[in-house]
Amino acid sequence: MIHQYPGVIIKNNEEMPYPRVCAHRGFSAVAPESTMAAFGAAVAIGCEEVEMDLWQTADGVIVASHDTGLERVSDGTGDLKDHTFAQLRALDFGIKFSPEFEGTRIASFEEILNRYAGRVIMNLHLRHEEQGQDFLTGYIKKIVSLIEKYGDEKYCYFMASNIDTLRLLQRIAPQIERCAGEEDKKPCDYLLEKALETGCTKIQLFSPFFNRYREELGRDCVAYMVEKAHKCGVICNLCIADEPELTKDYLAKGVDTLLTNRAQLTQTLRNQYIRVNGIG
């Protein structure tokens, strides 16, 4: 593992116990989402995981950003994918969050690895699925090459919703774990079927779909999916767990990893759950 910032190496993705807290786009309640400040804040409070969305710039640099549009998160305009890395670095990715973060720059994936490889487990949401197989293959290989450069294979896992992307990941990088994400307008059971077909070790439930699933199943979908997944040896992530009562409910139903924008609150609730239930 090579990086210029010496520090503690944590347990890897196979060893780290559950339930875990995954800081969604970093600790995005206290710092601009998907920036080094947000990831650093998540690591500082001891989150086991951080989640990030990875895009490729016009000149081939892999960067972290949820939006492909620049307007919400920066002082720029247009599509991230149409800008070079230098053009993106000239933009301010902090000013719209708070004046205190003025001057915050977009982070490349290599910068993130250089600082945090081995210090936090990374849930890597792959994007660009609409750009075709050839592009996607090159994009994935570039990300895998960076992960291998920093020896972070056991501290990362890929999250993708498209079954063809999951198959491609299985072929290109079988050594890196995969997580199957949900797709709009697909039946509830399809998520686990897709995960098993593509050798995924995790699934990621998405709370905006829960009402539709509840109507489809006629019962609580979280308990149903967690039970089915665990019977197959599959880990369950859930996105998003921001509300305290819902978070407690998700933990009680056996959700393994909680993606959250309120990392410290969710961490407190998780720790209380562990103490009360004598876990660990």
Name the predicted role of every residue range:
Residues 1-280:
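Phosphate-group recognition and catalysis centered on beta-loop-alpha active-site segments
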